[in-house]
Regions:
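Nucleotide/phosphate-binding catalytic cleft detector across ATP-hydrolyzing
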Residues: 1-167, 186-202, 222-271, 276-318
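Phosphate-handling catalytic cores of nucleic-acid transaction enzymes
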Residues: 170
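Short, acidic (Asp/Glu-rich) active-site segment that either coordinates a divalent metal cofactor
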Residues: 178-181
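Acidic, metal/cofactor-coordinating or nucleic-acid-engaging core segments within structured domains
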Residues: 211-215
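Plant-skewed but cross-kingdom recognition/interaction modules and surfaces
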Residues: 218-220
């Protein structure tokens, strides 16, 4: 019997799985003392952990400390609950897991084996408690897929039907923007896979700096999200500074894509990732065209990882 496929997108800003709401890539270790408020609490290896809105500093290699391992255990527990593998009132769960994950295409060669060691732990039994449910899992396999490529898996038939010679997959994430070029035949052009440090976190930093310099106020990522996406208006002047700074950042990002040879006029652009969703109105105004694809589900990569892992397991069992 195949293990249960759990897909986790370990982003620099958010952790995503196919069936749960994204949660912030932030963690507090309370040591051996349980926190006063126990929502979203994990007990692992004698330490209590809770989620926080403060994000972990950017890590090129997420296997260098314990943070993303613990975040992934929380994601696995949340996903199993959302998928119905934990019944109401159930206190113990035992499950073998195939963990489907992703990396920027340019990082896979260097980091895929590290992910296998770090998250797989040689298939050893892992015991933890999440929200008063005891989990015993074995990660019997780790599969690593290319970000961006995974996200478009459900849309490939639509993309393949396009008349353009090339499609660019532009994944604006937390810290990086990853660009993958496809030929019309669906082949990835490995000579053009770019990853550069112009993600949405840098935009937050620029907005925070502008607000601090102008108003001597500190705004966090979630306040900025609330202003840009949800219509929150903390006052005309502050609102204008946030929107103007974000617009300038998005324009610079689009122009930097053009500078590295991404042709957004003759190709078919596909935008994915939380940064694309956040900056969508500005990106659309900069494109100057109305035939493009925005994949507006921030969980798209996680959904793609799950599809690709299940497809691989099915093929192996034939």
């Amino acid at each position: 019997m195949n293990p249960l496929v759990i897909a986790v997108d370990t982003g620099n800003k958010n952790i995503k799985t196919p069936h749960t709401e994204p949660f912030n890539s932030g963690l507090i270790c309370h040591g051996a003392i349980p926190p006063a408020v126990k929502s979203d609490t994990l007990l692992f290896d004698g330490n209590y952990y809770t989620l926080t809105q403060s994000r972990i500093p950017y890590m090129y290699n997420k296997t260098t400390d314990w943070s993303y391992y613990v975040l992934t255990l929380i994601a696995i527990a949340k996903e199993m609950m959302a998928m119905g593998y934990v019944r109401p009132g159930q206190k113990q769960v035992k499950q073998d897991v195939c963990l489907a994950m992703g990396l920027p295409p340019t990082h896979i060669h260097d980091l895929a084996s590290e992910y296998d060691k770090y998250f797989g732990r040689d298939g050893r039994r892992v015991v933890f408690t999440y929200n008063n449910v005891d989990f015993e899992i074995r990660i019997v396999r780790v599969m690593v897929f290319p970000q961006g490529v995974a996200a478009i898996a459900p849309y490939m038939s639509k993309i393949m039907a396009r008349p353009e010679a090339y499609t660019y997959i532009i994944d604006i994430g937390g810290y990086t923007t990853d660009v993958v070029k496809f030929s019309r035949g669906g082949q990835v052009d490995m000579a053009f896979c770019e990853s550069f440090n112009n993600g949405v976190i840098k935009m937050y930093d620029e907005v925070q700096r502008a607000v601090r310099n102008r108003f001597q106020l500190d705004v966090d990522d979630y306040t900025i999200d609330n202003i840009l996406r949800c219509g929150y208006n903390p006052g005309k002047e502050l609102n204008d500074v946030v929107h103007t700074t974000a617009q300038n950042y998005a324009r610079t990002l689009i122009r930097s894509l053009k500078d590295i040879g991404v042709d957004l006029t003759l190709s078919y652009p596909v935008f994915i990732g939380g940064g694309s969703i956040l900056m969508r109105p500005i990106i659309e105004s900069e494109l100057g065209r109305d035939d493009y694809l925005f994949i507006d589900d921030p969980r798209a990569n996680a959904v793609g990882y799950k599809m690709m892992a299940e497809s691989r397991l099915t093929a192996e069992n034939r």
